[in-house]
């Protein structure tokens, strides 16, 4: 949706959806119930996933820097999953809304696994914002 909002604004010069665009971007950057940027180790973010579900973490060889994690899932879905546990993770218990959950844990593949498609889709918005910033100078 973020990409569609940006493209609509750029192609039509119509700012009808600018609030939606801003909200979608800001949610990914940490304006969400958990206060967590959903991009691993994003520079400038105060709080971001530090323990994504990745072999790089479990093998101690690095992190998935720049990866967009899955994000929250419905509590019912999370509770039905097998092999998920919160050992050694940050569970954000006091911030969990009643119907959704998010955890920063290498053992939570449902909410904290970096996704290739999501990460790839972030390239366009960030490139678009960079281009817009440069054109204003």
Where are these regions (language model features)?
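Aromatic (Trp/Tyr) and acidic
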Residues: 1-137
């Amino acid at each position: 949706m973020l990409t569609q909002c940006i493209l609509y604004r750029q192609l039509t010069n119509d700012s009808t959806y600018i609030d939606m665009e801003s909200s979608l971007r800001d949610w990914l950057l940490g304006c969400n119930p958990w206060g967590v940027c959903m991009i691993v180790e994003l520079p400038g973010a105060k709080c971001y996933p530090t323990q994504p579900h990745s072999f790089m973490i479990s093998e101690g060889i690095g992190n998935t820097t720049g990866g967009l994690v899955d994000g929250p899932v419905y509590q019912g879905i999370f509770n039905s999953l097998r092999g998920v546990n919160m050992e050694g993770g940050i569970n954000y218990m006091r911030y969990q809304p009643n119907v959704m959950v998010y955890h920063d844990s290498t053992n939570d593949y449902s909410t904290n696994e970096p996704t290739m498609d999501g990460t790839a889709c972030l390239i366009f918005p960030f490139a678009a914002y960079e281009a817009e910033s440069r054109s204003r100078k």
